[in-house]
Amino acid sequence: MSKVSGGGPCPRRRDGVDPALRSRARRRALQAVYAWQISGGVAKQVIAHFAHEQAYEVADLVYFEDLVEGVLTHCAELDEKLTPYLDRTIEEVDAIERAVLRLGAYELLYRQDVPYRVVINEAIMTAKRFGSKYGHTYVNGVLDRAALALRKVEVLG
């Protein structure tokens, strides 16, 4: 068990993953991807800035870096995978929801160790916290349909 600031012990899964720390890493990754989208910044600078701040917040730094580097590296591919499920161009999607969708698509494609239901639920919770009033419902609909295509065996199994 690990101690999380402001709370009691946080149970780890059998594989050693602490879900609370992963959730924090996702929230920080959202902020980094959002900053990158808005500023058009250099990927390495954005990661370095947020990784430095991340060190002061209890979170899964390795997972944070994987998410941010993965989204920034595979952004065009992620957008291509999301496009069939959008009702507008990716550029027209609200910047927060766009960042959440890209992070969710990255996890669906490249983090097979994370169940698709966890990916979608975490994306919904993040969109509720940071996005527009109904942004989480849009994120849910898009990622739910994307999961069916990207992880068909897992979703239908």
Swiss-Prot record:
Cross-referenced Gene3D superfamilies: NusB-like
Presence of the UniProt keyword Transcription in the record: yes
Entry-linked InterPro entries: NusB-like_sf, NusB_fam, NusB_RsmB_TIM44
PANTHER family: ANTITERMINATION NUSB DOMAIN-CONTAINING PROTEIN, N UTILIZATION SUBSTANCE PROTEIN B-RELATED
Similarity comment text for this entry: Belongs to the NusB family.
Biological role: Involved in transcription antitermination. Required for transcription of ribosomal RNA (rRNA) genes. Binds specifically to the boxA antiterminator sequence of the ribosomal RNA (rrn) operons.
Protein name (Swiss-Prot/TrEMBL): Transcription antitermination protein NusB
